[in-house]
Amino acid sequence: MTQGKQPDGVARTSYKDTLNLLQTSFGMRANASQREPELQEFWKQQGIDLELGLNNQGQNFTLHDGPPYANGALHMGHALNKVLKDIINKHQILRGRQVRFVPGWDCHGLPIELKVLQNLNQEQREALTPLKLRKKAAAFARKQVDSQMAGFRRWGIWADWEHPYLTLQKEYEAAQIQVFGKMFQKGYIYRGLKPVHWSPSSRTALAEAELEYPDGHTSPSVYVAFPAAKLPEKLRTSLGNQGLELPNNGLELGQALQIAIWTTTPWTLPANLAVSVNEKLDYSFAVDNQGRLLLVAAELLPSLRDTLALELTARATVKGALLAGLIYKHPLLDRDSPIVIGGEYITTESGTGLVHTAPGHGVDDFNTGQKHDLGMLCPVDESGTMTSEAGPFAGLNVLKDANPTIIAALEERGALLKHEPYAHRYPYDWRTKKPTIFRATEQWFASVEGFRNEALTAINSVEWLPASGRNRMEAMVRERGDWCISRQRTWGVPIPVFYEREGNEVLLNDETLAHVKALITEHGADVWWERNEVELLPPAYAAEAERWRKGTDTMDVWFDSGSSWAAVASQQEGLAYPTELYLEGSDQHRGWFQSSLLTSVAINSQAPYRQVLTHGFALDEKGRKMSKSLGNVVDPAVIIDGGKNQKQEPPYGADVLRLWVSSVDYSADVPIGASILRQIADVYRKVRNTSRYLLGNLHDFDPERDAIPVPELPLLDRWMLQRTAEVMDEISTAFDRYEFYRFFQLLQSYCVVDLSNFYLDIAKDRLYVSSPSERRRRSCQTAMALIIERLAGAISPVLCHMAEDIWQNLPYSVAEDSVFRRGWPTVPETWRDPSMMAPMHQLRELRSAVNRVLEDCRSQGELGAALEAAVRLEAHSEALQEALDWLRQQGDPDVDGLRDWLLVSHLQVGGEPWAELLASQDNALATIEVARARGSKCERCWHYETDVGQHTTHPTLCGRCVGVLEHQ
């Protein structure tokens, strides 16, 4: 087969103006820095970004916003969280549900207090009263809220921005006081002296949620020998029966027998009041190579021989129960203390099996101390400095010089068996990044024990996404202790309690609570610092106001945010309680999810949410946590607006940021970085270019005038609508299940594989070359108009700006002024024809196989465009033959020709094999032969036809193109 050249001497005419080329104002580039704010202003002016959700007639959908902390610049964690919420809200609005998203901010707490103090010099600090500090903190928080709000809005987040909730608002603070009051009335609030997590660096108690456990912490681990002073008779008898006789004299007994303990907090040894054992364990009296007996758990003897480098041989073994009542001497202080029975926390996993017990410095120690009436000793002040109760160690700091000093003293007394560093998880203050301690103080607690079972029941009523969240929350609530809710800080909601000035009585009752709540409702929590006891107490107590002093503690910030269901969701118009959904990072199982659950269950015996969805953390491309020191911080503002070097950090716009959020499996930690952003931007461009192609080919199309009924469309168009229906169904399911990565995958495949590479690739000829109003062109435009409207709707929860831009650039009129007023895209049943799926699958497989052979020819320089080729096919599979018959019998002759679908100039199915071949391939599907197409290239449609040159008016055109021009 040969290809002819154009006749010599023929003047070439440009036929570009006779083609139906793209016409659209929808840009190839997004110009996001200008266009996105314009679209956001359009939504605002048209009442789309708020009123649309408020005015919907469907069921209420409340996604309650977990308040971010009002401090610092927005980061990728904010972006992941807020965009996920916005995608869900926009989808629900499109589904016709009533949505009012109220954004919130957590405004109290130490970080803001510290920020205020950092900006003051020493003189200003000294002049700072608590009330002045609060005023400055409130101003700082509000400024941070304004800054963060502007960032959220730039991301295209829809919310009731004019009415956010801030935990510093007086109505919020009053609702929080009411939550506290109701819990108090139910007996769930109490004051007690208990060991709590204490931060010497912040000088306040901390809740579990305010702790972090950084890698790399080591503590000084010591094995210590406590000399025995007196044995209970039952124990002495049991030892005698085993042939072990011990001295009666206390001094001699102490030299002969010593109790071995292990601790990683040597600084707590001055507070030791007992040694605890497990009554069920076996304990050995083991002689070492110095002739001394050490009391240790029998099971640990082999490991202790290695650890202590001692020859330890058991002389006698008894159950732990027999050790109760053994008296020992403190190795550093003049104090005798007993061995007592502890609990199941005493194991043989580490240490010696005997536990140094300081009730003032540990929860298990405290509980054991309560059980055995050991008393309380906590010789450490709020800064971590040892008090006079620590004897010779007074003045030492427990996190600095106390440990080495005490270890040296133990060694000097001969009581130190071993000293080595020990790496383990240790709690740090999440704000100051410094170690915490356990310290017994008078604090206010919420008695979780009082409603633990109800909380566990409530957890089971919630749908947790992912499902593992249920087990995580159950374990935390089942194992947690009572909640320490008091803080020794100024910037917060006051614990509304009065203390007797001369005695120990506490004044807190329904009357005082109601009075304080009324004052805060009117004036805000500052009133607690602005007024004296005469005004803060109810009138009935005014006469004895001098007897009382107001408390200075504030509430844990987790109690603040944990009251949001009461202050916001259950109070404000357009919201619902229990809410449909809470959505935050996975760290909130021990934070906001839990504090909200506890307060809601305590008061109303139900969870505040029906669903809880968690996401992971944003990491760099190597899976590392972002930090300034590593230089791997990805700034969402730079993603949107670009960096200093815009070639290296181009301005991608908010939609690319949003598309990234949709692309990740957020149930785990998610990576983000320059190369990932380039990939996401590439997908964005493909979706945009596909949309632009659809819009550009509709410039002369009016659906009312030009559309063809769907049942009358050619097979190719009907299949494309059937495929669109499938994709829309799958996208709807993905959104319903919050599986946005499935949306991302479906969108990419639909735009690239189904539309660009197949349907639109085939459609170019009939779109460009046909007469403008020709049926083969109008049928394609009909399908394209139906597709672009649904594509715009389907992407609108994620690519909200692009979707609206598409809608504003539709070249024909539609009833709705915004894509969001159209609602969630649906497809008529006339689009659905599952019988097309099997034959179309075969034909697409055939097209892919032919393209591979053509590509091989191109790579070898034997072919340029596919239209230079002629192809002969021979079907091998029955399924393909049936598909070819189906296409031939049911296809539209002007559109559904296999030659046009393969984009070649000539096609032969069956018949004799060709002689002059460029390539030939046999596979299970078919025999594919490729040769050069006969004829010459038409200057207008680029097909190779044998009739080119036969038309004197247009000597470089094929007969088809001549016919089109003559018709025009």
Swiss-Prot record:
Q: What is its main location?
A: cytoplasm
Find motif ('KMSKS' region) and give its ranges: 625-629
Question: Which cellular component terms (GO) are annotated to the entry?
Answer: cytoplasm
Q: Which PROSITE patterns match?
A: AA_TRNA_LIGASE_I (PS00178)
In alphabetical order, the GO MF annotations are: aminoacyl-tRNA deacylase activity; ATP binding; isoleucine-tRNA ligase activity; tRNA binding; zinc ion binding
Instruction: State where the protein is found.
Output: Cytoplasm
Q: Which SUPFAM superfamilies match?
A: Anticodon-binding domain of a subclass of class I aminoacyl-tRNA synthetases, Nucleotidylyl transferase, ValRS/IleRS/LeuRS editing domain
What InterPro entries does UniProt report for this protein, alphabetically? aa-tRNA-synth_I_CS (IPR001412), aa-tRNA-synth_Ia (IPR002300), Anticodon_Ile_BEm (IPR033708), Ile-tRNA-ligase (IPR002301), Ile-tRNA-ligase_type1 (IPR023585), Ile-tRNA_ligase (IPR050081), M/V/L/I-tRNA-synth_anticd-bd (IPR013155), Rossmann-like_a/b/a_fold (IPR014729)
Gene3D superfamilies to which the protein is assigned, alphabetical = 1.10.730.20, HUPs, Ile-tRNA synthetase CP2 domain-like, Valyl/Leucyl/Isoleucyl-tRNA synthetase, editing domain
Q: What class of enzyme is it?
A: ligase
Q: Which UniProt keywords apply?
A: Aminoacyl-tRNA synthetase, ATP-binding, Cytoplasm, Ligase, Metal-binding, Nucleotide-binding, Protein biosynthesis, Zinc
Return the motif ranges for 'HIGH' region: 68-78
State how the cofactor is bound: Binds 1 zinc ion per subunit.
Write out the GO biological process terms. isoleucyl-tRNA aminoacylation
Keyword Zinc-finger, does the record have it? no
Q: For binding ATP, which residues are annotated in this chain's numbering?
A: K628
What cofactor requirement does the entry state?
Answer: Zn(2+)
Sites where the protein binds Zn(2+)? C938, C941, C958, C961
Domain free text: IleRS has two distinct active sites: one for aminoacylation and one for editing. The misactivated valine is translocated from the active site to the editing site, which sterically excludes the correctly activated isoleucine. The single editing site contains two valyl binding pockets, one specific for each substrate (Val-AMP or Val-tRNA(Ile)).
Q: What does this protein do?
A: Catalyzes the attachment of isoleucine to tRNA(Ile). As IleRS can inadvertently accommodate and process structurally similar amino acids such as valine, to avoid such errors it has two additional distinct tRNA(Ile)-dependent editing activities. One activity is designated as 'pretransfer' editing and involves the hydrolysis of activated Val-AMP. The other activity is designated 'posttransfer' editing and involves deacylation of mischarged Val-tRNA(Ile).
The record describes its quaternary structure and partners as: Monomer.
Describe the family membership recorded for this protein in Swiss-Prot or TrEMBL: Belongs to the class-I aminoacyl-tRNA synthetase family. IleS type 1 subfamily.
Supply the PANTHER family for this chain: ISOLEUCINE--TRNA LIGASE, MITOCHONDRIAL (PTHR42765:SF1), SOLEUCYL-TRNA SYNTHETASE (PTHR42765)
Record-given protein name: Isoleucine--tRNA ligase
- Native species: Prochlorococcus marinus (strain MIT 9313)
Q: Which gene encodes it?
A: ileS
